[in-house]
From Swiss-Prot:
MF-aspect GO terms: cobalamin binding; metal ion binding; methionine synthase activity
UniProt domain B12-binding: residue ranges: 90-210
Domain B12-binding N-terminal residue range list: 1-90
Name this polypeptide is given: Quaternary-amine-specific corrinoid protein
Keyword Metal-binding recorded: yes
Binding site for methylcob(III)alamin: H103
Family note: Belongs to the methylamine corrinoid protein family.
Database matches in SUPFAM superfamilies: Cobalamin (vitamin B12)-binding domain, Methionine synthase domain
Pfam families: B12-binding, B12-binding_2
Oligomer and partners: The proline betaine:THF methyl transfer system is composed of two methyltransferases, MtpB and MtqA, and the corrinoid protein MtqC. The L-carnitine:THF methyl transfer system is composed of two methyltransferases, MtcB and MtqA, and the corrinoid protein MtqC.
Cysteines engaged in disulfide bonds, as pairs: none
Role description: Involved in the degradation of the quaternary amines L-proline betaine and L-carnitine. Component of a corrinoid-dependent methyltransferase system that transfers a methyl group from L-proline betaine or L-carnitine to tetrahydrofolate (THF), forming methyl-THF, a key intermediate in the Wood-Ljungdahl acetogenesis pathway. Acts as a methyl group carrier between MtpB or MtcB, and MtqA. A methyl group from L-proline betaine or L-carnitine is first transferred to the corrinoid prosthetic group of MtqC by MtpB or MtcB, respectively, and then transferred from MtqC to THF by MtqA.
Gene assigned in the entry: mtqC
Organism expressing this protein natively: Eubacterium limosum
Length: 210
């Protein structure tokens, strides 16, 4: 039985070598799928620590990006043991960067952290046309739609997208995120909530599907 506390701490401390050593040793013991899910849960707990430290100002954006990459690596090591991916999905999220905005670092961090928390994420990429958001939302009927943006112009794009989604009868929860996003912007867009912090954004999504 692996020591999950050590794994959680290693992820929280961003100790890549330690994380990989623990996981490779664990996989070598030919674990069951249920045990592998415990390993994923320990990694997720470590990601929550990273999110908290980021909120406290101990970690920076670069650390969050690294943590997301570390988590992807960890999940890849465990994939052969996790079987067909029958792990319970926390919920489904459709994300993309607002039309006219080409920034994706924040969105990518959010995607990594949401996937780590057990969400199934469909990422439409950057500069996503309003019609694309609407068509995909109608096709996959996600629990949550997330629109990110760094430029001030993204707010108007978010509003146009939000209006189009509502007009199309899409009733997914809508969260918007990025530097220019404020409570006022959230009300203007007609979103259910907003965040400027990927870790906090994931917590909001967890509360919605919890």
């Amino acid at each position: 039985m692996a020591d999950w506390k050590n794994l959680t701490q290693a992820v929280g401390d961003l100790e890549e070598d330690d994380v990989m050593e623990i996981l490779n040793d664990f996989v070598a013991t030919n674990p069951t799928e249920a045990e592998a899910e415990e390993a994923v849960a320990a990694c997720q707990a470590g990601m929550a620590v990273v999110g908290d430290l980021f909120e406290e100002g101990e970690y920076f954006v670069g650390d969050l990006i690294f943590a997301g990459e570390l988590l992807t690596e960890a999940i890849n090591v465990l994939k052969p043991v996790l079987g067909s991916g029958d792990t319970a999905v926390a919920g489904t999220i459709l994300i993309g960067t607002a039309h006219g905005d080409l920034h994706d670092i924040g969105k990518n961090i959010f995607r990594s952290m949401a996937e780590a928390a057990g969400f199934q994420v469909t990422d439409l990429g950057i500069d996503v046309a309003i019609d694309t958001f609407v068509e995909k939302a109608k096709e996959i009927k996600p629990d949550i739609i997330g629109i990110s943006g760094v430029l001030t112009l993204a707010i108007d794009s978010m509003k146009e997208t939000s209006d189009a989604l509502k007009a199309a009868g899409v009733d997914s929860k809508l969260i918007i995120g990025g530097n220019p996003v404020t409570k006022e912007a959230c009300e203007y867009v007609g979103a259910d909530d907003f965040t400027t912090n990927a870790a906090e954004g994931v917590k909001i999504c967890q509360a919605w599907v919890g």
